[in-house]
């Protein structure tokens, strides 16, 4: 079944266009295995006067609205017709956004072919499986970019990371993982396509070791991060290097975005003065007191379920 390449792929590309300076998802995107039932749409349409302020955020709100409408249109169709109906509805809703995205978010256009290849090639042969795989991939792509852009207007409240459940003392490592990831993503973006995964993993391990003062030699010393990565790309571990890197980066993107949001929410203004007064002491002893990865476990579980 043919896909209208530059219509459908545009919205998968949304999750692939931001560089490390704007988000962690440069060239990131992955295609989970087909689900037994169609995936739940990534988010609800934004209400009038939503919180989106940038062109990219506003575009994402429109994408989510069109996505939900297309899923709803296919919901009651026979399994063999679901993909065709979804594609037609989604393409129709996107017509008015193509020109807008080209003018206001020009970085999308160069990513269209890559987005199409990563998403559509993962679709199964049968129409039923193709629909599930495609919608699941699109759902995950939208959730990744929603977190990266912090478009809370298109993210249900139930999907927010609840920092109150995370012990304050265990938030210390978040900034260190975040910094290490940015260093690694920047290094990987400059590497040839087939080398991205190797460069990213090596750079991330090195940066994590340096940022934590040797407390964590590699990301594999944080079991929950390693488990999340394995879970995310288990089905595609033998895929092409560029796909493996995209999956790896997307998994860590979601985890670190969750931890960063939790960290911000866990620092009330009333405690700002106290926190500032203890920064020097904390920095001097960080390597010795880095907490166990319970924070990573909690925030990662939340994100893998809800993003």
UniProtKB/Swiss-Prot annotation:
InterPro entries: Poa_pIX/Phl_pVI (IPR002914), Pollen_allergen/Os (IPR035506). It comes from the Eukaryota. Transmembrane segments: none annotated. Keywords: Allergen, Signal. Pfam families: Pollen_allerg_2. Pollen, starch granules. Residues 1-25 form the signal peptide. Belongs to the Poa p IX/Phl p VI allergen family. This is Major pollen allergen Lol p 5a. It comes from Lolium perenne (Perennial ryegrass).
